């Protein structure tokens, strides 16, 4: 359905089991168009499902930065930065899935103007350096990747993590100093990940 705030089609996903700790949504950018610019006091992580395009990011008083993405890209607009997503193709829509902690912010503040129209700049989260969205970063403990942009998760080869099961591989992602994180796991044919449990909010996406 049309989502006026976004300027594109979208659907909100509020899964049972998230405990209102986070939510998700799917959004579609019309061919050759852009979504409306927005900023917000909650974290957001975006995974591109279809198409290619670009995102422009900025804060008050800084130069705008634009980086390109494609199907399989993973990134996060830094907290409360202005960001605008563009569809780079004129003949088909671009679609992405986003996970956010909007429910926490909305339940805590009960004020949409504070959440969506707050001028505070988190300079510790976003420094507008030229290489901010270059895809570079640091790898900690062999499997924790601290970065701000992943061009193609399908092309990654995660390191082995046999303590989770024989043939298991895993990469953990820390994006733009968010408290929300993500990881990708790979299992060999006929293998499985050892049983485990954790708190609410996990969104599982099957890549292949």
Predicted feature locations:
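A short beta-strand-loop-beta hairpin characteristic of the jelly-roll/cupin
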Residues: 34, 39-71, 81, 197-198, ...
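The feature marks the first
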Residues: 2-7, 19-23, 27-33, 47-55, ...
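Conserved short histidine dyad/triad with adjacent acidic residue
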Residues: 5-12, 23-40, 166-170, 181-198, ...
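A short, N-terminal "cap"/entry segment at the start of jelly-roll beta-barrel domains
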Residues: 1-20, 112-184
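A short beta-to-alpha transition loop/helix N-cap that caps and shapes the active-site region
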Residues: 104-110
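Conserved metal-binding segment of the jelly-roll/cupin
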Residues: 30-31, 67-89, 97-102, 189, ...
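Beta-strand elements of modular eukaryotic interaction domains
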Residues: 3, 14-17, 36-37, 73, ...
């Amino acid at each position: 359905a049309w989502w006026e705030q976004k300027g594109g089609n979208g659907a909100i996903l509020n899964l049972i089991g998230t405990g209102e700790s986070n939510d998700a949504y799917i959004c579609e950018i019309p061919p050759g168009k852009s979504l409306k610019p927005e900023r917000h006091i909650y974290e957001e992580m975006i995974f591109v499902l279809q198409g290619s395009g670009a995102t422009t990011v900025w804060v008050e008083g800084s130069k705008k930065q634009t980086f390109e993405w494609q199907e399989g890209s993973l990134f996060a607009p830094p907290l409360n930065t202005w960001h605008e997503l563009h569809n780079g193709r004129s003949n088909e829509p671009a679609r992405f899935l986003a996970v956010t902690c909007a429910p926490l912010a909305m339940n805590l503040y009960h004020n949409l103007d504070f959440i969506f129209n707050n001028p505070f700049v988190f300079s510790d989260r976003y420094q507008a350096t030229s290489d901010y969205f270059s895809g570079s970063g640091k790898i900690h403990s062999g499997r924790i990747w601290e970065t701000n942009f992943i061009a193609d998760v399908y092309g990654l080869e995660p390191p082995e993590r046999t303590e989770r099961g024989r043939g298991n591989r895993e990469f953990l992602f820390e994006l733009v100093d968010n408290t929300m994180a993500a990881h990708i796991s790979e299992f060999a044919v006929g293998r499985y990940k050892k049983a485990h449990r954790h708190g609410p909010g996990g969104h599982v996406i099957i890549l292949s």
